[in-house]
Amino acid sequence: VPHFSKLRLQQLAILLGVWALWLVGGALETSSTAQVPEKAPLRWGERAPGLHLQPFRAPLRHRNSRRYLKNQKILLLVFGDIACPAYHLYLPRIVGLKEKIAELNGEILWIYPHALDSNLIPYPGAKVFKDLLGQSMGAYRIARLPTLVVLQKDREQARIPFLWSRKIRLGNWSIRYVGAVDQDPEGRAIGIRQDLVEALRDLTQSSYVRIPATRTHGCP
């Protein structure tokens, strides 16, 4: 009987130890979560983070060549994902802004978290990039795909290199708009505000955007 009681006590002590470790682990996890709050979205006027991207199937003659964002005044960053239904719903409306962006001396950069088949690029000649490690999505605090980010050049700058397979430095560019094309992913509403179009229209007058951030609709 004494031997049986001692064994039971040892088992009970082990169970109590495991339970105590579980409680401590839960407390540490809660404390860690509380100490690292979720980052807020980028806001109008903030400096644009650099982009760490890989080009989509760059020709060999371009892999080590330099290109420059010399004449562009506006950049539209499209963070998309072909696996997300909302991306395909919004895609025609984003592509439809290509001429408007060009009128503003702008460029569209299409950024995906995955490789892309050539038949899935938005249009011939589109500047498509891969963010395989999620560095650019993290830097721009992207929570849902698709998300559109409009950047504006603050002033004339020296020749800042736009390099294949390297970081795109955007030191003199600032955030002007972050959000969706509009608040109607399915495109069925009549008379709904065209948020991205209005932001681009504002930028033809100044750097001020009346509504610089909107809710995004898509996949986390």
What are these regions (language model features)?
Residues 72-75, 104-107, 126, 145-146:
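Loop/turn elements at helix/coil->beta-strand transitions in domains of secreted/extracellular proteins
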Residues 88-139:
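Structural microenvironment flanking redox-active thiols in thiol-disulfide oxidoreductases
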Residues 164-220:
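Thiol-/selenol-based redox modules, centered on thioredoxin-like
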Residues 52, 123-164, 170-171, 175-176:
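Short, internal strand/loop/helix patches
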Residues 65-88, 200:
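Short active-site neighborhood of thiol/selenol oxidoreductases, capturing the structured segment around
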Residues 13-26:
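Bacterial N-terminal signal peptides
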Residues 3-16:
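Bacterial N-terminal signal peptides that target proteins for export
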Residues 33-67:
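N-terminal "domain-start" segment that seeds a small globular fold
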